[in-house]
Curated annotation (Swiss-Prot):
Subcellular location, principal: membrane
SUPFAM superfamilies for the chain: Helical scaffold and wing domains of SecA, P-loop containing nucleoside triphosphate hydrolases, Pre-protein crosslinking domain of SecA
Cross-referenced Pfam families: P-loop_SecA, SecA_DEAD, SecA_PP_bind, SecA_SW
Listed GO biological process terms: intracellular protein transmembrane transport; protein import; protein targeting; protein transport by the Sec complex
UniProt EC number: 7.4.2.8
UniProt-recorded name of the protein: Protein translocase subunit SecA
Residues where ATP binds: Q85, G103, E104, G105, K106, T107, D494
The keyword Membrane is assigned to this record: yes
Function: Part of the Sec protein translocase complex. Interacts with the SecYEG preprotein conducting channel. Has a central role in coupling the hydrolysis of ATP to the transfer of proteins into and across the cell membrane, serving as an ATP-driven molecular motor driving the stepwise translocation of polypeptide chains across the membrane.
Record's keyword terms, sorted: ATP-binding, Cell membrane, Cytoplasm, Membrane, Nucleotide-binding, Protein transport, Translocase, Translocation, Transport
Localization per Swiss-Prot or TrEMBL: Cell membrane; Cytoplasm
Length: 788
């Protein structure tokens, strides 16, 4: 059956044709723009803005606007965008992903759509993967925008709010994904509109879009607060799981493919004895089951120096797609605390979640989203389904001359690494630069030791040593350079060939292991052969590589043994084996996509609720008039719920005392309503009596606060306090609910449907609690006039 998303993806030739037509139209204005003086060229910005206000669309302005900023690029930077870069710019303006090979000038390409989309004045955000690139691109490309009369802002994580606000007030703002994501969350915790910093989510252009939209999509952005100390539970769970034995007939099993671990029946029995409980999976033990599950995963599915490093007494995650340390990022659901318990370092409080959002749902809030990267085609179905973006492969300006050699496969790791070192030695002796890609810190350090023994000078770039990343990567194309880098360290920095290197064959790229994503392998290859340079790439693999162990190495091993290829130095170049490896990668990519999709499905439930709550907060903060029209209906609904709850059955059985208690606790300070006042009254009469009481109390406070602004601020404070308190509690409730349904999913339940159903009632209860608290806080507040 054909994937319905696949059917929606346009034919590549047809895609390119429409963008080539726009490039033709842009190039037709080249001479006209070149003939203008600087002042005349700069005046084009105001002309375009005026034409836009008078009804022309950005699509209609595109050819001239692109031609104008293209000419500005030439005058300011000395760089004139090629035709293929115009095509890339048109793809980006269309709200799609432009796949452009390494060295094809993505940053320069971006000047055209960024300039065009900044003309309406609603703000353009250019998002990068790190602060170095944010500042570098803003400084370099900012010269062009300033020349054309547009303002540029830079938003960094640690900036004070007034600087952030100024940055977002600019026509074009450069920022990292985490900085703007956290700004958005903090804006929706603000108490006044003046505290907010982000102006609007209009048009975003994402650099290294695959890294941000796909690789980072599983980890939500979380703003946390302090909570009860639960360190003891992490430590006890860690001590328990360290007593267990692995195996289906033992205590636990590990799913290496999914990076999960589960107790067997025998393990469950051991847990019940260890923790002195009757049934581990009773509802009352849901939290304990979660602690044990996270401890199992931390100890047996994640590994030091591969998934994380321990530095300065802290556990720091390694980004599996870049090899860098992910500063400030922590695993959610208690997994990070489980790492800390495992490693014996200080356990940092889990805290309550004050606000959270996935990057997927954050970027989907923009009116238009676009991105550029060197590799995205393998993920085009996901990008189409999640973000409604096409992936368009932009032609290279020069033909790619890099030669991608077939993989070579060894029986074991020793044979593979010996071959890698021999190949590096051969290339080093003739002066050809080598970039060696590794998947883990361990591998990079092992190779470094082997090269030291051979007397081969080299640089190592990994999560433990990334301070001079851009400098090391930039030098990797010089004669005789040998650079070992985990994954795609140095993305965004060009590797230019030194003098005479092209004659030696260009940059040689050696992969020491296939990554679980074909896209990351393609990125490593793409470091060589930029702008028509020569180069070559080859991957060296072994049956003991992680990917092979996880996916069917046994079958390949048997085949190699039948071919008498089972000693250290045996090497295989076999199409069937290469196909098996690609098949394994596709399986992992599918699993990772399923995981990201699951994260999105759960967060989509929260997204709908979050948008309602955040919109409500915004309306309250924006209000300059009394909020009576919002507040009094809240009070009436609260009265209805309380009265209805205590007037079921026959009238003689009504719980009038509880209604009076509600009045005393939430409506009135005078105690003027008693049970006797309610006796004999109908349900409707009781409600009307309480409505009247609430109205009198409301208008009494309005009279006491004769200053209109004071009254509005008082109403805002009460409402925002209630909303925030219960929303934060709701986030924690939803986290616990998700953990609970995931644990119960070991039965026959569909956890997502369970979650959606329970989330609806949990949300409704939160709304009821907000309205009750708003009623109580407002009505019982003692109003004192400010004395002047």
């Amino acid at each position: 059956m054909v994937n319905p998303v696949r059917k929606l993806i346009e034919n590549p030739k047809r895609q390119l044709h429409k963008y080539e037509h726009l490039a033709d139209l842009t190039e037709a204005h080249a001479d006209e723009m070149a003939a203008l003086s600087d002042k005349q060229l700069q005046a084009k910005t105001d002309e375009f803005k005026s034409r836009y206000k008078n009804g022309e669309t950005l699509d209609q302005l595109l050819p001239e606007a692109f031609a104008a900023v293209r000419e500005a690029d030439k005058r300011v930077l000395g760089l004139y965008p090629f035709r293929v870069q115009i095509i890339g710019g048109a793809v980006l303006h269309g709200g799609n992903i432009a796949e452009m090979k390494t060295g094809e000038g993505k940053t320069l390409t971006a000047t055209m759509p960024v300039y065009l989309n900044a003309l309406p004045g609603d703000g353009v955000h250019v998002v990068t993967v790190n602060e170095y690139l944010t500042q570098y691109q803003a400084e370099e490309m900012g010269q062009v925008y300033k020349f054309m009369g547009l303002s540029i802002g830079v938003n960094l994580n640690e900036m004070p709010n007034d600087e952030k606000r100024a940055a977002f007030a600019c026509d074009i703002t450069y920022t990292t994904n985490s900085a703007i994501g956290f700004d958005y969350l903090r804006d929706n915790m603000a108490q006044t509109m003046e505290e907010r910093v982000v102006r609007s989510l209009n048009y975003v252009l994402i650099d290294e879009a695959d890294s941000i939209l796909i690789d980072s999509a599983r980890t939500p952005l979380i703003i946390g607060g302090s909570s009860d100390n639960v360190n003891m539970f992490y430590q006890r769970a860690d001590r328990f799981v360290k007593t267990l034995d692995e195996g289906e007939d033992k205590d636990y099993t590990v799913d290496e493919e999914q990076k999960t671990a589960m107790l067997t029946n025998q393990g469950i029995h051991k847990a019940e004895i260890f923790f002195n409980i009757d049934n581990l999976y009773d509802d009352q033990n849901v939290a304990l089951a979660h602690f044990i599950e996270t401890a199992l995963r931390a100890n047996y599915s994640f590994f030091r120096d591969k998934d994380y490093v321990v530095r300065d007494g802290e556990v720091k995650l390694i980004d599996q797609f870049t090899g860098r340390i992910s500063e400030g990022t922590r695993m959610s659901d208690g997994l990070h605390q489980a790492f800390e318990a495992k490693e014996g370092v200080e356990i940092q409080g889990e805290g309550t979640t004050l606000a959270s959002i996935t990057l997927q749902n954050f970027f989907r809030m923009y009116k238009k989203i676009s991105g550029m990267t060197g590799t995205a085609k393998t993920e085009e179905e996901e990008l189409k389904e999640i973000y409604n973006m096409e992936v368009v492969q932009v032609p290279t300006n020069e033909p790619v001359r890099r030669v991608d050699e077939p993989d070579v496969l060894y029986f074991n790791l020793r044979g593979k690494f010996n071959a890698v070192v021999d190949e590096i030695d051969r290339l080093y002796k003739k002066g050809q630069p080598v970039l060696v890609g590794t998947v883990s810190v361990d591998t990079s350090e092992l190779l470094s030791q082997m090269l030291d023994k051979k007397g081969i000078q080299h640089n190592v770039l990994n999560a433990k040593n990334n301070a001079k990343e851009a400098e090391i990567v930039a030098q990797a194309g010089q004669r005789g350079a040998v650079t070992i880098a985990t994954n795609m360290a140095g993305r965004g920095t060009d590797i230019k060939l030194g003098p005479g290197v092209a004659d030696l064959g260009g940059l040689a790229v050696i992969g020491t292991e296939r990554h679980e994503s074909r896209r990351i392998d393609n990125q490593l290859r793409g470091r060589s052969g930029r702008q028509g340079d020569p180069g070559f790439s080859r991957f060296y693999l072994s049956l003991e590589d992680d990917l092979m162990v996880r996916f069917g190495a046994d079958r390949i091993k048997q085949m190699m043994q039948r071919m008498n290829l089972d000693n250290d130095d045996s090497v295989v170049k076999n199409r069937m084996i290469s196909r098996s490896i690609e098949s394994a990668q596709k399986r992992v990519e599918g699993n990772n996509y399923d995981t990201r999709k699951q994260v999105l499905q759960y967060d989509d439930v929260m997204r709908q609720q979050r948008e309602i709550i955040y919109d409500e907060r915004t309306q309250i903060m924006k209000s300059t008039e009394s909020l009576k029209s919002i507040f009094l209906p809240m009070v009436y609904r609260t009265i209805d719920r309380v009265v209805n709850a205590h007037t079921t059955g026959q009238q003689k059985d009504w719980d009038l005392l509880s209604i009076v208690d509600f009045v005393d606790n939430a409506l009135d300070n005078s105690g003027e309503i008693t049970v006797a006042d309610l006796n004999g009254k109908s349900l409707n009469d009781i409600k009307v009596l309480l409505y009247d009481l609430a109205n009198r109390e409301f208008f009494a406070k309005q009279d006491a606060l004769s200053d209109k602004e004071q009254m509005v601020n008082f109403e805002k404070t009460i409402m925002l306090r209630s909303i925030d308190q219960h929303w934060m509690q709701h986030i924690d409730d939803m986290d616990r609910l998700r953990q609970s349904v995931m644990i119960r999913s070991y039965g026959q339940y569909n956890p997502l449907i369970e979650y959606q159903t329970a989330a609806f009632s949990t949300y409704n209860k939160m709304i009821d609690d907000i309205e009750y608290d708003t009623t109580r806080l407002f009505m019982k507040a003692q109003v004192r006039q400010n004395l002047h």
